[in-house]
Amino acid sequence: MSRGSGAGYDRHITIFSPEGRLFQVEYAFKAVKAAGITSIGVRGKDSVCVVTQKKVPDKLLDQSSVSHLFPVTKYLGLLATGMTADSRSLVQQARNEAAEFRFQYGYEMPADILAKWIADKSQVYTQHAYMRPLGVVAMVLGIDEERGPLLYKCDPAGHFYGHKATSAGMKEQEAVNFLEKKMKENPAFTYDETVQTAISALQSVLQEDFKATEIEVGVVRADDPLFRSLRTEEIDEHLTAISERD
């Protein structure tokens, strides 16, 4: 692969190319897309929903052991898009950090603090020669006692932002375009509308109708702030509602 004046600058993570690029960080973003899945996050007025594809790479695998949705605490969920091994490593460290936070301060770690910690960690990985960036984009969701529903996205470069709706993975840009139209009027989605907007966004950009076993859906609600993954029957109900609406 020819990069002209960029050649040779992809061997060391800490060296900028003459154009001001860090190739290894750019490759980490490509690794996220190369995983071949697309994820969506949508924030409603009293809930947050994240949806991703559930692809089982091998017919002999136990389907229940394949997941991109992780509880960090009882109240915080994380949807990881990208390399599975990197995701699990990040989640394990995040759980340790959240437990340490609760022990030290006496209350649960808020979603924005967790997102900042993940972003800080990712940013440090872009500075040291003996590390590599994580090939993961993490969406963090939770209900804040003061600020209500929160949805954050953290990327391999160390950015983290709060979102009304967002996407990651293979069809990220197409999903963002779809969500921008849906969120144009700044709608105050109910819980059902939030879940169905996220699922229909995924169906629209991938141009396929999913079965309940082909996607994962994670939610938090203001009236029940515990993070949980929806059961297959619950996903089926939302898929039916979407097909009837369309």
Curated annotation (Swiss-Prot):
It comes from the Eukaryota. Keywords: Cytoplasm, Nucleus, Proteasome. It is found in: Cytoplasm; Nucleus. Its main location: cytoplasm. SMART domains: Proteasome_A_N (SM00948). InterPro entries: Ntn_hydrolases_N, Proteasome_alpha, Proteasome_alpha-type, Proteasome_asu_N, Proteasome_sua/b, Proteasome_subunit_alpha6. GO terms for cellular component: cytosol; cytosolic ribosome; mitochondrion; nucleus; proteasome complex; proteasome core complex, alpha-subunit complex. Pfam families: Proteasome, Proteasome_A_N. One of its GO terms (molecular function) is structural constituent of ribosome. GO terms for biological process: ubiquitin-dependent protein catabolic process. PANTHER family: PROTEASOME SUBUNIT ALPHA/BETA. The proteasome is a multicatalytic proteinase complex which is characterized by its ability to cleave peptides with Arg, Phe, Tyr, Leu, and Glu adjacent to the leaving group at neutral or slightly basic pH. The proteasome has an ATP-dependent proteolytic activity. Component of the 20S core complex of the 26S proteasome. The 26S proteasome is composed of a core protease (CP), known as the 20S proteasome, capped at one or both ends by the 19S regulatory particle (RP/PA700). The 20S proteasome core is composed of 28 subunits that are arranged in four stacked rings, resulting in a barrel-shaped structure. The two end rings are each formed by seven alpha subunits, and the two central rings are each formed by seven beta subunits. The catalytic chamber with the active sites is on the inside of the barrel. Belongs to the peptidase T1A family. This is Proteasome subunit alpha type-6-B. It comes from Arabidopsis thaliana (Mouse-ear cress). The gene is PAA2.
